[in-house]
UniProtKB/Swiss-Prot annotation:
Glycans are attached at N144, N168, N174, N354. It comes from the Eukaryota. Coiled coil: none annotated. The chain crosses the membrane at residues 27-47, 52-74, 89-111, 179-201, 208-230, 254-276, 289-311, 400-422, 443-465, 475-497, 518-540, 569-591. It comes from Homo sapiens (Human). It is linked to Genetic variations in SLC6A18 might contribute to the disease phentotype in some individuals with iminoglycinuria or hyperglycinuria, that carry variants in SLC36A2, SLC6A19 or SLC6A20. This is Inactive sodium-dependent neutral amino acid transporter B(0)AT3. PROSITE patterns: NA_NEUROTRAN_SYMP_1 (PS00610), NA_NEUROTRAN_SYMP_2 (PS00754), NA_NEUROTRAN_SYMP_3 (PS50267). Belongs to the sodium:neurotransmitter symporter (SNF) (TC 2.A.22) family. SLC6A18 subfamily. Does not show neutral amino acid transporter activity.
């Protein structure tokens, strides 16, 4: 086996200057906590349920094996070898690729704005869980105290608390509304907690991560044990994992599987590059990539089982309530004795009455009661946490305790992800020396958190939820795929496969297998090209959003509306802003080198008019010894 050349001693000595993790456990927990986030709890179970249950695992595993793990390995390897943040890493590989690092920093900044807003929402619900009864358990009375608020009666108590008492949402994105002070306070508190945890980088996050990364697994286990003992839990699990293979013909399934991999592993954020830069240069990054990716996958499955065992109970409970209301209508209209119709007898009785009294039965307010319909009502994203799961808690004994556990788990999950997201912004800024050396890191961290907080106040407006959906749909998904594509291409085709494999051999003691080389060189770039092309095609369709409008004729269903022109422009800008750094930085580098070449040419004697041909960037993947 060929061995990579030994690096300069000065490069190795850099490890004494750069901060290091106290132990391997801190690093693995930080990477796992950064990767395992809110999406593992509410997006992955929803995708499994939407796309054919167990059938969704097929594209998910394929995307994980041929796209997720290889790119994850690339990020850990370049961060560990160069011992810099994303900007420093890509500048070292090629100055023309410095825009990739700037794009990662910009993307992490944008994601941190709306992600910590969700953490603020979670904090608001967590604080409201310390009361009995829970504030979303019943509708508030109207002004006359003669009934309940009409909007709440037309929807549900949990929906009213979410859309009106929490978000106080407007009916249209054009109506910005005012800042909601309770959300602003929770947002400030969330950023204050993040600042205190990342104030000194890995020195402080390495201590907090023991709790924030492990506590969610404890709560998931508690919910799983409790959920499996509830009636209807097995129905939820059967519905979740029953495969529908025909759904694999839908290209959207494969796109969602690919994007879920990027969200669940937090790829292309730059956070893993930053975390890996604090490792020992001889750390086995290949093993870390595989272990963390598999832990992340098992966490998603584990969370799906826990979530849908509880949602199966809710669906069964709603289904039985629907049957009971229909049975009561039949008993009252046909003067049957009380309890004369059981739930098991209801279908036969209804069929008999339809045959003998069809007109009379047609006039009754009977609803179609199908268990599958209630299982289909599970929601994705914040709706799962703030509407579906809060309603489920109400049916469980000791509802406030379960609410506190659930939102406490979400809060710690969100914090763990925020640690990596903020570190992806701060580490490159420290590496490039944005502030003078005498300015402490605590000041830069505080400045970044303050700017993020002020920028995120737009999400505390009454229209803030619409803006959050725009950021989530257009700032995150397309840029993650495009930046990941540039990462793979930059390492394999700009830096060079052989040189990269030599570096990995020096770090891990073994050269990458054909699996790694094939995925890096062909499979991952090809898959990413297809996914990016498909996303571009989706952008040609009219852009729509769903509004909460109590005056909508189909209320409580959300009204689908077209984005206004200015909002569409914002969508396009957000989808291009991070990746625009790539051509801009490359052009700036080209102009800088051209000016330098012209200046050198003017300074030479007239007899030597030959330009300097050695203008290639120094892409030796050795750390810069002139670093803090």
């Amino acid at each position: 086996m060929a061995h990579a050349p030994e690096p300069d001693p000065a490069a190795c000595d850099l490890g004494d200057e750069r901060p290091k993790w106290d132990n391997k456990a801190q690093y693995l927990l930080s990477c796992t906590g950064f990767a395992v986030g809110l999406g593992n709890i509410w997006r992955f179970p929803y995708l499994c349920q939407t796309y054919g249950g167990g059938a969704f695992l097929i594209p998910y595993v394929i995307a994980l094996v041929f796209e997720g793990i290889p790119i994850f390995h690339v990020e850990l390897a370049i961060g560990q070898r160069l011992r810099k943040g994303s900007v420093g890493v890509w500048t070292a590989i090629s100055p023309y690729l410095s825009g990739v690092g700037l794009g990662c920093v910009t993307l992490s900044f944008l994601i941190s704005l709306y992600y910590n807003t969700i953490v603020a929402w979670v904090l608001w619900y967590l604080l409201n869980s310390f009361q009995h009864p829970l504030p979303w358990s019943s509708c508030p009375p109207d002004l006359n105290r003669t009934g309940f608020v009409e909007e709440c009666q037309g929807s549900s108590a949990v929906s009213y608390f979410w859309y009106r008492q929490t978000l106080n949402i407007t009916a249209d994105i054009n109506d910005s509304g005012s800042i909601q002070w309770w959300l602003l306070i929770c947002l400030a508190a969330s950023w204050a907690v993040v600042y205190m945890c990342v104030i000194r980088g890995i020195e402080t996050t390495g201590k907090v991560i023991y709790f924030t990364a492990l506590f969610p697994y404890l709560v998931l286990t508690i919910f799983l044990i409790r959920g499996l003992t509830l009636p209807g839990a097995t129905k939820g699990l059967i519905y979740l994992f029953t495969p529908n293979m025909h759904i694999l013909q839908n290209p959207r399934v494969w796109l969602d599987a690919a994007t879920q991999i990027f969200f669940s592993l937090s790829l292309a954020f730059g956070g893993h590059i930053a975390f890996a830069s604090y490792n020992s240069p001889r750390n086995d990054c290949q093993k870390d990539a595989v272990v963390i990716a598999l832990v992340n996958r098992m966490t998603s499955l584990y969370a799906s089982i826990a979530v849908f065992s509880v949602l199966g109970f809710k669906a069964t409970n709603d289904y039985e309530h629907c049957l009971d209301r229909n049975i009561l209508s039949l008993i009252n209209d046909f003067d049957f004795p009380e309890q004369s119709i059981s739930r098991d007898d209801y279908p036969a009785v209804l069929m008999h009455l339809n045959a003998t009294w069809p007109k009379r039965v047609a006039q009754l307010p009977l609803k179609a009661c199908l268990l599958e319909d209630f299982l289909d009502k599970s929601a994705s994203g914040p709706g799962l946490a703030f509407v579906v799961f809060t309603e489920t808690d109400l049916h469980m004994p000791g509802a406030p305790v379960w609410a506190m556990l659930f939102f406490g788990m979400l809060f710690t999950l969100g914090l763990s992800t925020m640690f990596g997201t903020v570190e992806a912004v701060i580490t490159p800024l420290l590496d490039v020396g944005v502030l003078p050396r005498w300015v402490p890191k605590e000041a830069l961290t505080g400045l970044v958190c303050l700017v993020c907080f002020l920028s995120a106040t737009c999400f505390t407006l009454q229209s803030g939820n619409y803006w959050l959906e725009i950021f989530d749909n257009f700032a995150a998904s397309p840029n993650l795929l495009m930046l990941a594509f540039l990462e793979v291409v930059g390492v394999v085709y700009v830096y060079g496969m052989k040189r990269f494999c030599d570096d990995i051999a020096w770090m891990t003691g073994r050269r990458p297998s054909p699996y790694w080389r094939l995925t890096w060189r062909v499979v991952s770039p090809l898959l990413l090209t297809i996914f990016v092309a498909y996303i571009i095609l989706l952008f040609w369709k009219p852009l729509r959003y769903k509004a909460w409008n109590p005056k909508y004729e189909l209320f409580p269903s959300r009204q689908e509306k077209l984005y206004p022109g200015w909002a569409r422009a914002a969508c396009v800008l957000l989808s291009l802003l991070p990746v625009l750094w790539v051509p801009v930085a490359a052009l700036a580098q080209l102009l800088t080198r051209r000016r330098r070449t012209w200046r050198d040419r003017d300074a030479r004697p007239d007899t030597d008019m030959r330009p300097d041909t050695d203008t290639r960037p120094d892409t030796d993947m050795r750390p810069d010894t002139d670093m803090r």
